[in-house]
Curated annotation (Swiss-Prot):
It comes from the Eukaryota. The lineage of its organism: Eukaryota, Metazoa, Ecdysozoa, Arthropoda, Chelicerata. One of its GO terms (molecular function) is toxin activity. Expressed by the venom gland. Inhibits voltage-gated potassium channel. Disulfide bonds join 59-80, 66-85, 70-87. Residues 56-93 form the BetaSPN-type CS-alpha/beta domain. This is Neurotoxin beta-KTx7. Residues 22-29 form a propeptide. It comes from Lychas mucronatus.
Length: 96
């Protein structure tokens, strides 16, 4: 049981490291889909990677990265909503 927890922790830390060094979430999720068998562990990894990836867009500090991300994924303009980057959903208020 301890070995399974250690492997899970190492997988999670590895995926977080990959997602924080410039890889897009879709690339890291693809690695999870390819190498982790279906089940609770896979679902937990995917949810954890998604949460970490949503915090990596630099909102509201780096607004241009949010736009770049949305243009890359959905070909829409990106807008910072607090710490979240939302594609094609403009703010109803001005941040700066």
């Amino acid at each position: 049981m301890q070995a399974k927890r250690t492997i899970l922790l190492l997988l999670l830390l590895g995926m977080v490291a990959l997602s924080s060094c410039g890889l897009r979430e879709k690339h890291v999720q693809g690695l999870v889909n390819k190498f982790v068998p279906a089940g609770i562990v896979k679902n937990l990894l995917q949810a954890g990677i998604h949460k970490v990836a949503k915090m990596q867009y630099g909102c509201p500090i780096i607004k241009d990265y949010c736009s770049f991300h949305c243009n890359d994924l959905e070909k829409h303009e990106g807008y910072c909503h607090g710490t979240k980057c939302k594609c094609n959903i403009p703010n109803q208020y001005e941040l700066f």
